[in-house]
């Protein structure tokens, strides 16, 4: 049996849709259930940020996780495949009536992705104060907590609704298939078979 960690929300639905096409089974989680067993697969419903931990520690053989999470945490996993679902961007956001001021001695950036933010602004030789937040990040520049934010953006509508605009795009992100290193050795044939079946479906699901 292969255990697969999925992120809650749309990416999980899109991933299960791929499995339905491949195997012809329903692959539906019962209401509020966090585990789904179907055929040779056990799916776990997990917070996106926790998936690298589940896979790294061996609680899951395989996981589906955003590239932004991989770049933020750099987990020790095997990166198998870009699934081309869950597409989004990591962007710098600022108030509509402002511009990023690189002449400041220090920029205050509110984000839940401090490593991505730090690496990006380091390339611009800009001193940074990171303000780590876990939600409502758009609020930070509006109340003077930060000069700007670094956050995941899908359509940009949330920023617009809160009086912010995209100043710069740091990276493009989409969901990736990853594997535990030990599982990739012990269950290599099963994981590679799954990899090839999913890869065949990707052009049809974009």
UniProtKB/Swiss-Prot annotation:
One of its GO terms (cellular component) is cytoplasm. Its main location: cytoplasm. It is found in: Cytoplasm. Signal peptide: none annotated. PROSITE patterns: ATP_P_PHORIBOSYLTR. It comes from Campylobacter curvus (strain 525.92). Lacks the C-terminal regulatory region which is replaced by HisZ. Catalyzes the condensation of ATP and 5-phosphoribose 1-diphosphate to form N'-(5'-phosphoribosyl)-ATP (PR-ATP). Has a crucial role in the pathway because the rate of histidine biosynthesis seems to be controlled primarily by regulation of HisG enzymatic activity. HAMAP family: HisG_Short (MF_01018). Keywords: Amino-acid biosynthesis, ATP-binding, Cytoplasm, Glycosyltransferase, Histidine biosynthesis, Nucleotide-binding, Transferase. It is an enzyme of class 2 (transferase). Heteromultimer composed of HisG and HisZ subunits. Belongs to the ATP phosphoribosyltransferase family. Short subfamily. Pathway: Amino-acid biosynthesis; L-histidine biosynthesis; L-histidine from 5-phospho-alpha-D-ribose 1-diphosphate: step 1/9. Its EC number is 2.4.2.17. It catalyses: 1-(5-phospho-beta-D-ribosyl)-ATP + diphosphate = 5-phospho-alpha-D-ribose 1-diphosphate + ATP. InterPro entries: ATP_PRibTrfase_cat (IPR013820), ATP_PRibTrfase_CS (IPR018198), ATP_PRibTrfase_HisG (IPR001348), ATP_PRibTrfase_HisG_short (IPR024893). GO terms for molecular function: ATP binding; ATP phosphoribosyltransferase activity. Pfam families: HisG. GO terms for biological process: L-histidine biosynthetic process. SUPFAM superfamilies: Periplasmic binding protein-like II (SSF53850). This is ATP phosphoribosyltransferase.
């Amino acid at each position: 049996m292969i255990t697969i960690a999925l992120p809650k929300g749309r990416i999980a639905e899109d991933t299960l849709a791929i499995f339905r096409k491949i195997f012809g089974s329903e692959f539906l989680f019962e209401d509020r259930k966090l585990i789904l067993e179907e055929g040779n697969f056990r799916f776990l419903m997990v917070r996106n940020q926790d998936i690298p931990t589940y896979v790294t520690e061996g609680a899951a053989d395989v996981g589906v996780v955003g590239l932004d999470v991989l770049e933020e945490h750099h987990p020790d996993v095997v990166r198998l495949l870009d699934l081309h679902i869950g597409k989004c961007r990591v962007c710098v956001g600022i108030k509509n009536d402002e511009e990023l001021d690189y002449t400041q001695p220090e920029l205050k950036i509110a984000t839940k992705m401090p490593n991505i933010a730090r690496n990006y602004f380091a390339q611009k030789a800009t001193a940074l104060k990171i303000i780590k937040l876990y939600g409502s990040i758009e609020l930070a520049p509006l109340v003077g907590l930060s000069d700007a934010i670094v956050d995941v953006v899908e359509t940009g509508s949330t920023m617009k609704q809160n009086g912010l605009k995209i100043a710069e795009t740091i990276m493009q992100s989409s969901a990736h298939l990853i594997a535990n290193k030990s599982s990739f050795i012990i269950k290599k044939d099963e994981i590679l078979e799954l990899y090839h079946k999913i890869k065949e479906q990707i052009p049809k699901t974009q």
